[in-house]
Structures are given as structure tokens and as C-alpha cells.
Amino acid sequence: MASVEYLIKQFLTPDKKQLDLSNQNIGDKGAIKLTQSKNLCRLKKLILPNNNISDEGITAIANSENFKQLTDLDIYGNVISDDGVKAIAESPYMSNLKKLSLYGNLVEDEGAIAIAESQIL
């Protein structure tokens, strides 16, 4: 796997509003690295399918001020469970989210209820 900073340079759109890291296998360590990049503070769309991200990685993303402008979060095909979805549903930084793609994860009723009842989303 290439370094996350390299991937950001390669796949961040010129306007810095979209990052597509589909199928890069960044895992939780890579997801956490994303939260530390100041190049992503204008990001509107974050595309992370099939990256082996679990609750740890998505919780870091959900709790990062870097992503407070996100409107679109594609995290399908990872290993995120109810706890990770709850982190998204409860994070004040996810308040602009309009689209959340979760299919192919480990989300069950508890996570779905957290999204449905969220006062933030």
C-alpha cells in the first residue's frame, strides 16, 4: 500500500472537494492518517469503499474536524459495525452529511436505528 499522503496527492481533485480512495486497503491506520491531513479541510465527498476500515477508523473520521464539510461519505464494503455507525450518527462534524453509503458492512438494527434517530444527520 502506498502512503496515505501519496494517495491524497494522487486522488484528491484539484478543487480539493473530493477524494476517492476506493480499493486502496488503507485500513484503520490509513483512515486515522486522513484525519491528520490539513489538505482535506474543504472535502465534500470522501469515497472509501473496500478499504478494510473498521469501527476504529470510521470513528476517527467521524470525530475529525477535518471532515465537517462532508456531504457525501461512501464507506461500503468495509468492516464497520453498529459502533462505527453510532459514531457517525452522534458526531457534530457529520451534520452536513446528505449521503451515507454503508452497504456491505456489519451494520445491524442498532446501527440503523442510530442513523434513523440521529439529531445530527
Across the structure, where does each feature detected by a protein language model lie?
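Structural register of leucine-rich repeats
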Residues: 15-19, 32, 41-44, 59, ...
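Generic structural signal for well-ordered alpha-helical scaffold segments
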Residues: 8-9, 35, 62, 89, ...
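Residue-level signal for alpha-helix termini/capping positions
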Residues: 12-13, 39, 66, 93, ...
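Short, solvent-exposed loop/turn at the beta-strand->alpha-helix junction
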Residues: 1-4, 24-32, 51-59, 79-86, ...
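Concave beta-strand-loop units of leucine-rich repeat
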Residues: 19-26, 47-52, 63, 73-79, ...
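N-terminal segments that cap or nucleate solenoid repeat domains
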Residues: 1-52
